[in-house]
């Protein structure tokens, strides 16, 4: 194996051991040391908590008002019936919400195969027992709601999201949407040529039958990759502050000296010196103005007082004066 010591080994799928239709082992190697646990733990958490699936969320049973009751002719109490309904493994095509019905009478077990549904729904475990009827005259009728979701959502967390006037007899069920029943991984030693410090990741996975183990791992890896995409293209996404453009010069500096309302004598003296704008005037010093013909100390005092009243003074320095708008004039 040639290459730079800084290059990471890229793992490959070595084997998929199909133990049953719902149980498989997936083996990947070689992994850099430590990456077996890094990837194995991340995939395990996603497979257990973040895989989408379908679960029973509500049930209505004829003659039953609440879950802490029993039904005549049914061996199990209602809480046990609800627990059994949680074990239904359902596949639904192109729908997020479906209703199923179950009607059964006579002695014997009531199983998932007794549920009536349309062509978009498949009961993966038809032999799953829901309850037992103990009398020839006994019967049970129920309406089952199945919804798509992710992870585990207890019934208590959905109470406030439902209509305030929830009909009496509508029983809420803790929803376990994840199609993964069990996931475990272990990291073994691997070797590539002279390197013996590598990892081999073995993932053992069992599902409820609504998804194949290999497909479950593929989806989990896709979820992980999508979450990491943001780090691949990491950059400052904060919007730059929009700063208000301040004018280069105080607007008063761009006004003509006539706006100062000086005496005619003072105004004429300034015009004779080609001082047309207040910005031109404030850059002159007292000494420079006193050299202006016919402009004496009285006129100078008048000019200084007018400028002070406007927050200005003589001898100011203005960078980049005159502005383009004045220079063009």
UniProtKB/Swiss-Prot annotation:
Chain intervals for the UniProt region annotation (Alpha N-terminal domain (alpha-NTD)): 1-235
| Disulfide pattern | none
The record ties this protein, via CDD domains, to: RNAP_alpha_NTD (cd06928)
Q: Does the keyword Translocase apply?
A: no
Say which family it is in: Belongs to the RNA polymerase alpha chain family.
Q: Which UniProt keywords apply?
A: DNA-directed RNA polymerase, Nucleotidyltransferase, Transcription, Transferase
> What does the record give as EC number?
2.7.7.6
Q: Name one GO cellular component term.
A: DNA-directed RNA polymerase complex
Print the organism lineage. Bacteria, Pseudomonadati, Pseudomonadota, Gammaproteobacteria, Pasteurellales
Could you tell me which Pfam families the record lists for this protein? RNA_pol_A_bac, RNA_pol_A_CTD, RNA_pol_L
What SMART domains does the entry give?
A: RPOLD
Under the subunit heading, UniProt states: Homodimer. The RNAP catalytic core consists of 2 alpha, 1 beta, 1 beta' and 1 omega subunit. When a sigma factor is associated with the core the holoenzyme is formed, which can initiate transcription.
Its source organism is Histophilus somni (strain 129Pt)
Q: Which GO terms describe its biological process?
A: DNA-templated transcription
According to the record, the residues making up region (Alpha C-terminal domain (alpha-CTD)) are 249-329
Describe the reaction catalysed, as an equation.
RNA(n) + a ribonucleoside 5'-triphosphate = RNA(n+1) + diphosphate
Protein's gene: rpoA
InterPro entries assigned to the protein according to its UniProt record, in alphabetical order: DNA-dir_RNA_pol_insert, DNA-dir_RNA_pol_RpoA/D/Rpb3, DNA-dir_RpoA, RBP11-like, RNAP_asu_C, RNApol_insert_sf
Protein name as annotated: DNA-directed RNA polymerase subunit alpha
Q: Name one GO molecular function term.
A: protein dimerization activity
What SUPFAM superfamilies does the record tag this protein with?
Answer: C-terminal domain of RNA polymerase alpha subunit, Insert subdomain of RNA polymerase alpha subunit, RBP11-like subunits of RNA polymerase
Q: What does this protein do?
A: DNA-dependent RNA polymerase catalyzes the transcription of DNA into RNA using the four ribonucleoside triphosphates as substrates.
Q: Regarding domains, what does the record say?
A: The N-terminal domain is essential for RNAP assembly and basal transcription, whereas the C-terminal domain is involved in interaction with transcriptional regulators and with upstream promoter elements.
Kindly give the HAMAP family that the UniProt entry links to this protein.
RNApol_bact_RpoA
Gene3D superfamilies registered for this protein in UniProt: 5' to 3' exonuclease, C-terminal subdomain, DNA-directed RNA polymerase, insert domain, RNA polymerase, RBP11-like subunit
